[in-house]
């Protein structure tokens, strides 16, 4: 049975881990890094994922997609998304189904597809390490993700060729990694401030039992927002000095974003940094190049982002209230996410909870490690661990007057099932429409609509008489199913909620096929690159041999080799390059080069040079007068023995 892997699908970076014996292990990617940038880029020739995509972002801003986790499961007209769109160098479009999609190289991609490319990279990383195919995974999501976002993440896994055994909340995963070997009873708070989202979760850990008491958060608060504060500050300062608006230039905007991220990281360990971006623009009047050189202090950064940090404290207070606890009841605060390295964040968390946060976990890797532990639990490799999570938001339906009637309250332990009986609003009503919502507002329209369905053929009856039983069922992934049953006739209608505009089964199947086709194309491209490298190396070494020893060989042999090399060079040219053709050309040059070697040795033998070392022998031999390397080494050893 192949390993089940744990994946932290992050806004900024992603990470993959497995259970290695009794402990989770983070796997390094092909570039040797333990985390992979959650970036996908499209060029004329290929699709890039991770560090290669990040490296070319400045020169290809229109087609480099980042931070897609903030788009997943969201509508195009989402109010939170509106403020982000203007700061993104790539196009966010209406996917036709009302969802926010992205566009690159004139192709439309759903956020689930882009996420699938990142998950595919994580899958490849694990397969390369394990030496076997991986088909199953546990994937993490922010605790405050709604049903649509969870379903879209699960869809991404399917598109990537993974069976998603479990969707697990990121803070809960972090708690698993933190508390795996802890036997004592503890109440902990996990403060998770990542690249794009914020969560806080209160858990009780008791000898292998991990019980979530409450969770809260903001799916549009994270490091990306901190970066944009710096970007806007830099752009404003530059505009004051030079009168040029850098935010209108996509390439300059991408350079500012990279510089902002770098400066933010540097200011976690130093009090001041210099942001230096030469030739970032041009003076419109003189045509002279303009350079951006700005000093940024830690104090200035803290003033720019102070309200963002303060905003993260509101969910902390709400989570404590929902759990029925005070800050003094928390035994340990666990920090998760790269933003928790910022000194001001640590200071505010310490002030709020009244204690120094725990620093024994790696905030970038702990979530993936927790996902691997959950994978181990599902696979049976990890014993005596029980995880009880909660639903982050209340679930209910719209009733008469547009009121939101809750069936399942937030922070209810999942999986769970709840039923309630409703009736008709009019006489002789023969159908009801069940509209399902998720949220905390009193009016249904103010909450997130997850979907709707109809229960038809209700027998005519006075209003209030029919008995319609509505049942909500939330599975361990936090994904919702809803059914409605007419108790009089037994007629039932049931759906697994698919957000209006979410991907249909047909969409997913098409994307799975596209991913498989791309995987084959990627494999062919890799084979072509490897064949090209081998061919170029062979051409170089063979031409050098001709240059060094060509005078020892008859012209017809040299001519045959040069013809083979010319044919191989022709095979390497431009668009017509083909791996199989190149391999055939490599074979032809190799065979021709063998004749060169034979001719060289034959010429040496005829000249009586077989007893004398060749140039290659002189380089390798231990001294003059030795017939070959083996004898020379043997004689040296023999001398040493004496």
From Swiss-Prot:
Pfam families: HSP70. It comes from Ruegeria sp. (strain TM1040) (Silicibacter sp.). This is Chaperone protein DnaK. Induction: By stress conditions e.g. heat shock. Acts as a chaperone. The lineage of its organism: Bacteria, Pseudomonadati, Pseudomonadota, Alphaproteobacteria, Rhodobacterales. The modification Phosphothreonine is found at residue 197. GO terms for molecular function: ATP binding; ATP-dependent protein folding chaperone; unfolded protein binding. Residues 603-642 are annotated as: Disordered. Residues 608-642 have a biased composition (Acidic residues). Belongs to the heat shock protein 70 family.
